[in-house]
Amino acid sequence: MGTSMEPSSSKPEQTFVEELRRRRAELRESMSALELALAGPAPEDQARWAERVRVALVELSADFGEHVDITEGPGGLYGELLQAAPRLSGSVARLTREHALIRGLVDDLLERVSPPGANEDVDRVRDLGTALLGRLLRHRQRGSDLVYEAFQIDIGGET
């Protein structure tokens, strides 16, 4: 299955919305896994803690990469959105800029906990990880608001 999110006559709107929600849920699950890893005990075995954080970050990085592909890529959500509502180009540009910022935060954290067993300051990694999760949360909220404004479709909630 490709990463295109483009609704077409062969892919009804409902399927498009379901796929969008499914992918949002995957990203949210990755965010939750990172939150749990960051909150885990670290003082006694920092190497194991760092490895759990690294594994969660690798998964988050992959899911975020898919998010960028389905929003910015050919046939992606942002192209469809701009065709439907060109007035929202400023909001699309903002979300696109956020992708680069968030990617940088993910990459920085991965460097701090790689290779496994890296002796990085736990509190600093937690602070940076928490800041990353906050950025992702706000990005998701803005994305949900944008889709609703363009299409009057609520993609925000996951069950």
Outline where the language-model segments fall:
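Small-residue-biased structural context
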Residues: M1-T159
